[in-house]
Amino acid sequence: MTPNWSELVAAADPALVLPSGERRAEVAVPGPLRLDALLDLGEGHAVGVVRSADAARWTVPLVRDGAGGVRRSRPGDGTAEHLVAALARRGATPDAAFVLEAFTGAAPVTGERGIIVDQTNESVIVGECAVVKWAVRLPAEGEPGSPAAQRIAALARGGFTEMPRPWGLLTLAEGAQPVLLASVVAYLPGALDGWDWAVDDVRRLARGELTMDQALLPAAQLGTLTARMHAALAARGRTPATAADVAAWGVRMREELDEAVASVPGAEGERLKAWAPRIADVYAELDALAGTPLIDVHGDFHVGQILRADGRYAVVDFDGNPVLPADQRAARQPAALDVVGMTASLDHVGRVVVFRTPDVDPAPVRAWIAAAQRSFLDAYRTTLARLDADDLFDDRLLTPLRYAQEVREYLYAVRHLPHWVYVPDLSLTDLLPERLKD
């Protein structure tokens, strides 16, 4: 008698839940495993929601092996192909625990290869046409999952096209917010993210290979993209920030500032320590901002989330800020959060160019930083007004949120990349009015 999927999963090595890209030697998964739910894709392929002995839950693309067992599907095995084929059929899933939502354009394609990058999720390119992204670790029952499914669906329904065209979503029907198991979007061959294309553009500007107008055009295009994204996301609704919301922002920002002051070493730390009381005073301005509109936002918005291919721009990764708890990633936020994320990253592109380019003239780069941020904001405001959505954006949040973003850059440097400390140090040096530096 052939063992069923549940029996095969229970007998498998607990490392079954880990993708090959994850450092298996450093991640101990306790067994035995238990199969909570299974979507059978046919021909020995399935998607399982698997629970380890510590109650952690995992999305596992499964394939039966030649020895009568089961293993995690690898790129080339065909499980991602079978998921895309299921989307193309647009049929209901045989198990009510799963929701398979197909958008326009899903079609059966063949051929798989993995994307070799360090990421939380596992991605497979199918037929050089689509990218299947498997969510690896799932939230505990009752906890909110990734907001990506709802945000991608809202953008697709709202006619937002500045993202890789969504083919479909696989979710687990659980509670008020479905849990995302896999997303399928169009593959953009040759696409570069902003830490490549934007740095290259500004470097070419500094070398005289681009005019200032040419180098500023992407910033304006990103401003338009961001406004269209926010207008589409806001169609899901908006809520006013309460006094408690605003107070919580201030508490979190002051805690981060205190941590940065205590942990940033050297001359950069001394400068931050001197600036900290003035930055905290700016944070106090938040107290007057109860009532500002909150909407679904991207949540981790910077140039690295913007792909450029064939002169077009596409925003990716709607999972929210990975360092935040799931409930905060899913919560509505001010539109200014995304605006600040992008304007700060435009600034940081310029800092990187000056730091990494020998003999570069910093003057045109610094001029580009200021002009690019203005171009972005002007296009953003103009597009919101054209969409009758200018009430989404409260520009009183720009300064406190921007200071908070640079403080988080200090913390990122301390925790992960020590040399990065030059970026927020230079940014705040230019950002802070002279009166705040005294």
Curated annotation (Swiss-Prot):
Mg(2+) 2 binds at D317, D319. D-glucosamine binds at D300, E409. It catalyses: D-glucosamine + ATP = D-glucosamine 6-phosphate + ADP + H(+). ATP binds at K133, A186, Y187, L188, D193. A motif (Substrate specificity determinant motif) lies at residues 405-420. GO terms for molecular function: ATP binding; glucosamine kinase activity; magnesium ion binding. InterPro entries: GlcN_kinase, Kinase-like_dom_sf. Its cofactor is Mg(2+). It comes from the Bacteria. The keyword Transferase applies. Its EC number is 2.7.1.8. Keywords: ATP-binding, Carbohydrate metabolism, Kinase, Magnesium, Metal-binding, Nucleotide-binding, Transferase. GO terms for biological process: carbohydrate metabolic process. Binds 2 Mg(2+) ions per subunit. Mg(2+) 1 binds at Q305, D317. Monomer. Belongs to the actinobacterial glucosamine kinase family. HAMAP family: GlcN_kinase. Catalyzes the ATP-dependent phosphorylation of D-glucosamine (GlcN) to D-glucosamine 6-phosphate. May be involved in the phosphorylation of acquired extracellular GlcN derived from the hydrolysis of chitosan, i.e., in the incorporation of exogenous GlcN into the bacterial GlcNAc metabolism. To a lesser extent, is also active on glucose, but is unable to phosphorylate maltose, 18 other sugars and several aminoglycoside antibiotics. This is Glucosamine kinase.
